[in-house]
Amino acid sequence: MQIIKIMLAAAGLTALSLSCFAQEEEAPTRYTYATYYSCGGGPLARADEIMADDSDRMNGFVADGTLAAWGWMAHHTGGQWQRISWYQADGMDALLDAGDAIQGTGDDDADDAAAEEEDDGPGFGMICPRHDDYIWQVQNGANSDARGEVGMSVYHVCDVSREERADEIVDEHFAPVLNKMVKDGKLSSWGWQSHVVGGHFRRLQTMTAADAKSLMAARAEALEVVYGEDNAAGEEFTAICGDHVDYIWNAQLESN
């Protein structure tokens, strides 16, 4: 069974540390397809088991270049979503092709393993019957060799007419602070992504660290710098993207 196949098919493929990479200007634009699950119809451990059973196939898509990365994350704190499945590809066409490959509806050489365990699908659908799909465009970020076991996602509601200015503030004022924290080992990664398709959240800020305590300490330090007293850039950013919802996630599965 390929659970991502089933849930993407149900969603109609509306075109997810978390894992975001700094991009050079000439490099292809990286996109994230993220599915956020609301669960409660059964044991979440079973949903995690189903995803783990499919991890070899998903890892194969990374190995052959179909995907740049993918992952599965479990809720720790915040909000209503309880699980995330996500994958990334370089370029929108590549992202859409990856969706076809995951569903097993691509060209004649598409991976037949997508249908092998189809009977597991309804079990997952009963456990996590509702979901929200987003496509994000990676705008900025940095990562290290160390895997971030715990991540924070901040989903921003922004003034659409001024959200590009928020991107500029991130590039000019926030990125240097967060890049240094990655370099110093306080964070494993951070990222900034913009809305392409999906719900009402317009920007996604992520950071990951070795554990929850390290993550919260790094977050507090970063907030003090970028939103500290008399910080005009922080005040302007808040005026554009003030409303937000915070989540902390445990990284369950990941490959990049």
Locate each region found by the language model.
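Short S/T/G/P-rich N-terminal loop/turn motif that feeds into the first structured element of a domain
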Residues: 22-256
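Bacterial N-terminal signal peptides
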Residues: 7-17
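Positively charged n-region of N-terminal signal peptides that target proteins for export
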Residues: 1-6
